UniProtKB/Swiss-Prot annotation:
Region (Subunit association domain (SAD)): 59-70
Conditions for induction: Enhanced by dehydration stress.
UniProt-listed GO biological process terms: long-day photoperiodism, flowering; response to water deprivation
Protein purpose: Component of the NF-Y/HAP transcription factor complex. The NF-Y complex stimulates the transcription of various genes by recognizing and binding to a CCAAT motif in promoters.
Region Disordered: start-end pairs: 1-30, 168-190
Superkingdom of source: Eukaryota
UniProt GO MF annotations: DNA-binding transcription activator activity, RNA polymerase II-specific; DNA-binding transcription factor activity; protein heterodimerization activity; transcription cis-regulatory region binding; transcription coregulator activity
Source organism of the structure: Arabidopsis thaliana (Mouse-ear cress)
Listed name of the protein: Nuclear transcription factor Y subunit B-2
Keywords tagged on the record: Activator, DNA-binding, Nucleus, Transcription, Transcription regulation
């Protein structure tokens, strides 16, 4: 954050001059914990790279909004189908609908692998069918600290390494900078 932002008390996420959050508890619930966002960012960068507070806060807001955007679309689909549980397939459908189709194939592979690992971890020896989040999967994708911060599930480095091995890291599907997918598609949610 620049000096003028700091001096004026401005800045993202409502942090005041003392570095304390001035967001209400309700507003704070909208964002992923900044420590988790920072940890994920650091793992994607060289060991000696530094990340400014402003960059962390910006990324925190962006990823939180992205999650809300995709989840909202999946939720709308589930409501129309009179279902209460959003599953991984609903999220993939939402990403396609919203213009993030370049990410869907690597995520399908990841979701299948995640289900296989979860099946092995619970001793079932087989993945769950239907794609709904079961009791044993909540630690990894919902309650209990979230995907990157909680106990259970595939750890971040496995996830990161897996996507990198699939040669789809950061949407790199061979299309270069003008591959035309994702947020630059100009689509808005109605």
């Amino acid at each position: 954050m620049g000096d003028s932002d700091r001096d004026s008390g401005g800045g993202q996420n409502g942090n005041n001059q003392n570095g304390q959050s001035s967001l209400s508890p309700r507003e704070q619930d909208r964002f992923l914990p900044i420590a988790n966002v920072s940890r994920i960012m650091k793992k994607a960068l060289p060991a000696n790279a530094k990340i400014s507070k402003d960059a962390k806060e910006t990324m925190q807001e962006c990823v939180s909004e992205f999650i809300s955007f995709v989840t909202g679309e999946a939720s709308d689909k589930c409501q129309k189908e009179k279902r209460k549980t959003i599953n991984g397939d609903d999220l993939l459908w939402a990403m396609t609908t919203l213009g993030f189709e370049d990410y869907v194939e690597p995520l399908k592979v990841y979701l299948q692998r995640f289900r296989e690992i979860e099946g092995e971890r619970t001793g079932l020896g087989r993945p769950q069918t239907g794609g709904e989040v079961g009791e044993h999967q909540r630690d990894a994708v919902g309650d209990g600290g979230g995907f990157y911060g909680g106990g259970g599930g595939m750890q971040y480095h496995q996830h990161h390494q897996f996507l990198h091995q699939q040669n789809h890291m950061y949407g790199a599907t061979g299309g270069g900078s003008d591959s035309g997918g994702g947020a630059a598609s100009g689509r808005t949610r109605t």
